[in-house]
Amino acid sequence: MTKYIFVTGGVVSSLGKGITAASLGRLLKNRGLNVTIQKFDPYINVDPGTMSPYQHGEVFVTDDGAETDLDLGHYERFIDINLNKYSNVTTGKIYSSVLQKERRGEYLGGTVQVIPHITNEIKERVYRSGRETNADVVITEIGGTVGDIESLPFLEAIRQIKSDIGRDNVMYIHCTLIPYLKAAGEMKTKPTQHSVKELRSLGIQPNIIVVRTELPVSQDMKDKLALFCDIDTKAVIEARDADTLYAVPLSLQEQNMDQIVCDHLKLDNPAADMTEWTALVNKVRNLSKKTKIALVGKYVELQDAYISVVEALRHAGYSFDTDVEVKWVNAEHVTAENVQELVGDTDGILVPGGFGDRGVEGKIVAIQYARENKVPFLGICLGMQLASIEFARNVLGLEGANSSEINPDTPYAIIDLLPEQKDVEDLGGTLRLGLYPCKLSEETNAYNAYNEPVVYERHRHRYEFNNQFRPDMEKEGFVFSGTSPDGRLVEIIELKDHPWFVAAQFHPELVSRPNRPQPLFHDFVRASITNKESK
């Protein structure tokens, strides 16, 4: 029978529930269990696809085209699985589904209520995740903090699941904070006690408490928490700030967290073999070289907006025993006069995805600098579109060349709306989303990176390269090295007379893994290291 683990949070948000859940998933997978994982977000948006990155961080896209929470990126990178649309559920999705059923008459004229209709829909999403993946264990993270009014239906639903399928099949893990008060020189357990008290008042008794802390938690403090929270002392797990996220699974294993889980859920699996993971963490902690990459974006104040890009750069660096330092460059501040000052000390330049016109001209200036000064360059999504526009303007001499998204009246729409998007009015969930094939041309940097004729990558875009400009740009050394299999859509571009200048319409960062870097990032970082060594 499938087992269910629920991870909740208390005291404050951003405690690392997602990392805790992902780390536990890694440990259970390494015990030979088939693990899947999902995130429940209490906000009323149907998905984060139309939310500002300042509100939510990056939007993580799954193979099947779901626009999801950035925690799913952590889940995929840690557990090394590909998740799907069932892996992220919001209050908006739940209510939308229930209201559609009500309109279809599925409730037979009854009064639709939070209990049982909303809670039953939530429970169905939990069970469906297990059915669709045939998982041994389903880990569900509940977003937000215990005590939030938005979370109440989710907490009631997961309380009911224990009654539905039995205590041996359900486990509750609660993540809290033990703050350190400098003035008093003390760590305080009272916020955790109150958080657990609140959770218990809702009918949920946590089986494990994971406490975030800056300093070590004494045995006396663990005993005190265990007494007041009614759990075993060994089930108080310390989660101190780590030097690398990838060390967290090892810390949890050292405290036998995965064994406690298996004992409670009656799972008789051998101990997790973390030899390979330990080697990875040791490598990360002992990188001997450095390279600096300029990330030129418009959301650089909130680095979570580009979290998968940064992780993909780091993964690539691990392959070369190199610590990749990211220099955050606000695209709105970049001009032709100061670009040398802002990016001249870096070994490579990356322009990530985005929407809208803010910061576009600064990104184009940075791309021109990379092209003219032979600096390794990687463009992603909008970065690929702007690389095409920069080339059209400054090599072909097409003054005013632009994207019809940014300037609908441009005389040269190098980037234009996909034909199937012409009549689309809704913004949410209507882009070209998910995994699509890309055919590569031989003897190109893209082909050399993948070493395969056809690759599959995840997309999230509405605009595409305008094919009427392909012949003129090819004549000037602009290479279309990757296209859709029918040749209609441009997927990857690069430059002939440049050491390494590649840009992709898709989002390669979404499939990178710490022990298996994404090929374009791998070769981009290698080119950046070579550039540094040649200076």
Curated annotation (Swiss-Prot):
The active site is at C381 (nucleophile), H507, E509. GO terms for biological process: 'de novo' CTP biosynthetic process; pyrimidine nucleobase biosynthetic process. Residues 1-267 are annotated as: Amidoligase domain. Allosterically activated by GTP, when glutamine is the substrate; GTP has no effect on the reaction when ammonia is the substrate. The allosteric effector GTP functions by stabilizing the protein conformation that binds the tetrahedral intermediate(s) formed during glutamine hydrolysis. Inhibited by the product CTP, via allosteric rather than competitive inhibition. The keyword ATP-binding applies. Keywords: ATP-binding, Glutamine amidotransferase, Ligase, Magnesium, Metal-binding, Nucleotide-binding, Pyrimidine biosynthesis. ATP binds at S14, L15, G16, K17, G18, I19, D71, R240, D241, A242. UTP binds at S13, K188, T189, K190, P191, T192, Q193, K224. Homotetramer. This is CTP synthase. The gene is pyrG.
